[in-house]
C-alpha cells in the first residue's frame, strides 16, 4: 500500500521504518530541514547527548528500508490529496501549551523548547513548571558557564587550581535559576530510574526549587506567585514556560473524508514520552 507519514519525529520515523519493512511503499514528509523532532531538545540536558544517536539510527534505517524522505515539506490537505496515498499517518507532534496565567509586557518570556534550542537568556531565570521538561530545562540552564570535562582535566593535570575551587566551578554556572511548581513534588512524570539523577543535578547546581507555588502573573517586575497564602515576586530577566504541550492535528480535520485511511499517532494524538511514541509507531503497522 502507498503510505504517507507526515512528521519526522520519533513516532513518525518508527511508523515509516516499520511500514517499509513490511513491504509498503512509504514516503515521509517533514516540515523542518532535519529529522528527529523533539529528540533534538532531549539531547541538551546533561547526560542526554547520546539520544542524538537515535536520529542517526533512523536516518540510516529509513534509507536502508527505501523510505522516501522529503524534508522541508509543509503538509496541506491539498498536497496530501494530490499525492493520493492509500494510508496517511499523522505524526505532527505537539506545540507548547499556552500559559494559564496573564503575561504582561516588559520581560523576556520563552518556551522550554526555545531555551533548549539555545535562545539567549538573562542571568536570573525562572522556569515555570516542574515536570520532566521543566526540571531538565532548569538543569540545562543552570549548567551554563560551568567547567566542561576537558577543562577540568587540564586544570587537574596542571595543578592550576585547588580541588575545592575546581569543584565549585563545576557545580556553579553563570545563571541563577529558580524552578516553580504548583504541586508538592517536582518531576512526578520522570521515570523512577532517572528521577534521582535529575534531583541530584538540581541540588548540585544550586537550582532554587519552589513547590506548592501558584503563578499569578508575569510582568516587568518578575513572576508573581502565591505560596501558603502569601504573595511574592520572583525577580527575573527571563521566564521559561514548561507548562505542558497540546497536540498539533489541525490537518486531521482538513483531511476528513479526503483520504481512504487516516491514523493519528504520537504527540499528535496526545503528548507522551518519546519511547511511548516510538512504540505506537511500531504497533500501528499491524493495522495497515
Please place each PLM-identified region on the residue numbering.
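Rossmann-like dinucleotide/flavin-binding elements
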Residues: 1-31, 35, 70-84, 92-103, ...
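N-terminal Rossmann-like dinucleotide/flavin-binding domain of flavoprotein oxidoreductases
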Residues: 35-83, 183, 188-213
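Catalytic cores of secreted or luminal carbohydrate-active enzymes
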Residues: 87
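Short, hydrophobic/aromatic-rich segments at coil-to-beta transitions
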Residues: 219-223
Amino acid at each position: 500500500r502507498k503510505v504517507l507519514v507526515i512528521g519526522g519525529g520519533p513516532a513518525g520515523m518508527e511508523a515509516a521504518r516499520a511500514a517499509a519493512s513490511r513491504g509498503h511503499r512509504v514516503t515521509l514528509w517533514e516540515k523542518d530541514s532535519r529529522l528527529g523532532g523533539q529528540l533534538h531538545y532531549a539531547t541538551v540536558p546533561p547526560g542526554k547527548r547520546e539520544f542524538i544517536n537515535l536520529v542517526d539510527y533512523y536516518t540510516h534505517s529509513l534509507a536502508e528500508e527505501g523510505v522516501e524522505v522529503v524534508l522541508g515539506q509543509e503538509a496541506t490537505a491539498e498536497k496530501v490529496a494530490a499525492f493520493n496515498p492509500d494510508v496517511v499517518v499523522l505524526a505532527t507532534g505537539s506545540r507548547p501549551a499556552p500559559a494559564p496565567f496573564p503575561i504582561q509586557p516588559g520581560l523576556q518570556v520563552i518556551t522550554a523548547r526555545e531555551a533548549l534550542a539555545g535562545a539567549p537568556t538573562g542571568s536570573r531565570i525562572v522556569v515555570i513548571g516542574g515536570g520532566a521538561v521543566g526540571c531538565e530545562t532548569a538543569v540545562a540552564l543552570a549548567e551554563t558557564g560551568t567547567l566542561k570535562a576537558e577543562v577540568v582535566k587540564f586544570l587537574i593535570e596542571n595543578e592550576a587550581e585547588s580541588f575545592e575551587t575546581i569543584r565549585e566551578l563545576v557545580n556553579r554556572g553563570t545563571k541563577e535559576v529558580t524552578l516553580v511548581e504548583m504541586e508538592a513534588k517536582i518531576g512526578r512524570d520522570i521515570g523512577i530510574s532517572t528521577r534521582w539523577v535529575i534531583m541530584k543535578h538540581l541540588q548540585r547546581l544550586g537550582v532554587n526549587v519552589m513547590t506548592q507555588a501558584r503563578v499569578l502573573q508575569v510582568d516587568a517586575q518578575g513572576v508573581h506567585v502565591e505560596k501558603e497564602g502569601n504573595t511574592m515576586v520572583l525577580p527575573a530577566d527571563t521566564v521559561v514556560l514548561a507548562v505542558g504541550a497540546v497536540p498539533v492535528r489541525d490537518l486531521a480535520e482538513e483531511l476528513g473524508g479526503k483520504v481512504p485511511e487516516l491514523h493519528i499517532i504520537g504527540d499528535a494524538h496526545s503528548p507522551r514520552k518519546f519511547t511511548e511514541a516510538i512504540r505506537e509507531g511500531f504497533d500501528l503497522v499491524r493495522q495497515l
